[in-house]
Amino acid sequence: MQNQDFIAGLKAKFAEHRIVFWHDPDKRFIEELEQLKLENVTLINMTHASQLAVKKRIEMDEPEQQFLLWFPHDAPPHEQDWLLDIRLYSSEFHADFAAITLNTLGIPQLGLREHIQRRKAFFSTKRTQALKNLVTEQEDETSLDKKMIAVIAGAKTAKTEDILFNLITQYVNQQTEDDSELENTQAMLKRHGLDPVLWEMLNHEMGYQAEEPSLENLLLKLFCTDLSAQADRQQRAWLEKNVLLTPSGRASALAFMVTWRADRRYKEAYDYCAQQMQAALRPEDHYRLSSPYDLHECETTLSIEQTIIHALVTQLLEESTTLDREAFKKLLSERQSKYWCQTQPEYYAIYDALRQAERLLNLRNRHIDGFHYQDSATFWKAYCEELFRFDQAYRLFNEYALLVHSKGAMILKSLDDYIEALYSNWYLAELSRNWNEVLEAENRMQAWQIPGVPRQKNFFNEVVKPQFQNPQIKRVFVIISDALRYEVAEELGNQINTEKRFTAELRSQLGVLPSYTQLGMAALLPHEQLCYQPSNGDIVYADGLSTSGIPNRDTILKNYKGMAIKSKDLLELKNQEGRDLIRDYEVVYIWHNTIDATGDTASTEDKTFEACRTAVTELKDLVTKVINRLHGTRIFVTADHGFLFQQQALSVQDKTTLQIKPENTIKNHKRFIIGHQLPADDFCWKGKVADTAGVSDNSEFLIPKGIQRFHFSGGARFVHGGTMLQEVCVPVLQIKALQKTAAEKQPQRRPVDIVAYHPMIKLVNNIDKVSLLQTHPVGELYEPRILNIYIVDNANNVVSGKERISFDSDNSTMEKRVREVTLKLIGANFNRRNEYWLILEDAQTETGYQKYPVIIDLAFQDDFF
């Protein structure tokens, strides 16, 4: 033993005791006594010393002094020990290798000396120090061996999961990088006699047994046990030989698998092992005919995720009218909280796409007979309240599906085709036919107005000006987003309403005809009259001033104490620069162009829905800047027009051919023609722009009925200009900044609350279920809550796997919002008299949310063969 360890051992004893007894029957250290120097310690060689005199000196003469009493023999029996009373309040020092090692480690159990001696080769300086960081005073042979294994494996703790994580990581590195660390670890375990200890530990804790135990075989049994517990219960027989043996072992193994998937540090290792096991086991072959609902908990391999998705796609295609919506939505939510969706965004997007597809199918089922409304006002109201959701669901489905396709996956191809046919061939066709019937019956081309619906051409007078009747309103901001469709604005409004200091309210207005940029932008400006000038093509003039371009619009607005600016220019300004710029103006018009700039170009129109997502983000940021940095309190987000978009390429049937080529054309577009003395056509709406937009001249228009186009130049799938509701139902999203007191009173969307469904929680199996209730449905006032759920003992040790659950049900029936959580206990050492707690932890912040007392009363399951 090195001298410093010897000295350190003595110093450690004197740090806690005044008197230390040192028995050295082999007299190994008799020659070193003379050189032994310990500060403030008196050494007494008891070979010839009078024990009575020493006792007097220690207790009476020098009661504060520290003494080291060295004996050349073993401690005498108590009845012959003159110093017994002193010995009982003192400490003993042992100077053999094992004793000094125990002393260095800070372990007082001298009964471990023989075990330390057997493991003597383990105790290099480096390993001893690493072991010292792990041990406690309460060690036995088993716990000490486990911590030695942890040191050799390179684990930071002696938890079984940490040891396994390190060994598995070394195994994966060996397989993928030809790394030799695992070989070194295994050789070291064998050299120190710890290899059989490792396998016995795994047998005791997980029920793992094998004739020739190995990491490969352990992994096989872990994955098979995981599959057997989570997958279709009717398809377990094929896994039976490789399932771990005991109930407590299986529960511990399942808890390990849950922890493995949850710990992103070991993601690469899990993905590699899962792929290897998937190739070896081919679980998809066994579960191909299983119901996806029987696989709802399973996340063992990626092929299981793919099997579930295939089944859900088939269900949507084959059971679209009989689908159990609640079960379907619940399964989607559950799957999105599982491993493969959390680690591979394209799988999360697949379930988002399925959710929107189901939403679209449900809307179709509710309107299977078409869209028959008695008049235009009723039709308009129906669109604003519900029918716009067809367009929204279609857009969102394609947004997610395109993300999936971009990764090279074709899993949604058949559903893609089905949704496209539903939307384009049924919804748009039915909607346009029924809407056209109402427009024709009411002769709306000659009277372009709908009872109770504001008109876009009156926007400034009816929306902007009245704001100043409130003396507290000093400035109004108007954000005009080119081609912002009503359904996109609705999504924007929902997002804004999640902000505590803002409130958004969506209304609609009837857009001008033809519904295109120049005319729509002009209609939104303050004006008395709009007109075209024959010498300037399709440029619209407001009271004799051109409305084309930001500088001209700024000129018009200056007459009304207003100004115009592009959104990009405004966002580039520093806060004070922005405030200085708008200081002298009451009305600020901000032009934003993302959707139209993308959709109205042939080379980029396929990115229209991507542009909608970008626009929502940009507009929300713009609103936030106006309120927080420019101190805006009244903001209106509106548009010049909406748009029609179909994902599929158009055919010749989508094109209208005019019988006579119009002369005197001012503007020729895919969805409209503006000119003078235009010919009538059976397939077109014909009218005067004076009737539909308040233009003062005699210009006319032709618009294809329904969704057809005149030509496909400049892109054909993205269009506007016509009479379809998607084109002329223009959003007016009013956003208010709330004062502090109002903001505090404003009902804020907050996470749903979760409570235990039963007052007493009792677990009687190593793998058992707990029912939890989501108190409110997700909706306007409540948002989803994601929890980590697990069990701890009274020392706050985690004794189960951590389950990640998303509570996001929007069902209004309480019983439908109950979720069962399967918990896997770690080990079998549970006592019904001990205290345990069910912990509900916020998954994002990892802070406690709720806790409930739990009784664990396991049946006797492991006592016999």
From Swiss-Prot:
GO BP annotations, alphabetical order: defense response to virus
Extent of the signal sequence: none
Source taxon at top rank: Bacteria
Inducers of expression: Transcribed at similar levels in lag and exponential phase, rises in stationary phase.
Knockout mutant characteristics: No methylation of 5'-GGTAAG-3' in chromosomal DNA, BREX no longer confers phage resistance.
Record keywords: Antiviral defense
NCBIfam families: BREX-1 system phosphatase PglZ type A (TIGR02687)
The family this protein is said to belong to: Belongs to the alkaline phosphatase superfamily.
Function, in words: BREX systems (bacteriophage exclusion) provide immunity against bacteriophage. Part of a type 1 BREX system which protects against dsDNA phage. This system allows phage adsorption but prevents phage DNA replication, without degradation of the phage DNA. Methylation of bacterial DNA by PglX guides self/non-self discrimination.
Designated name of the protein: Alkaline phosphatase-like protein BrxZ
Species this protein is from: Escherichia coli O9:H4 (strain HS)
Name of encoding gene: pglZ
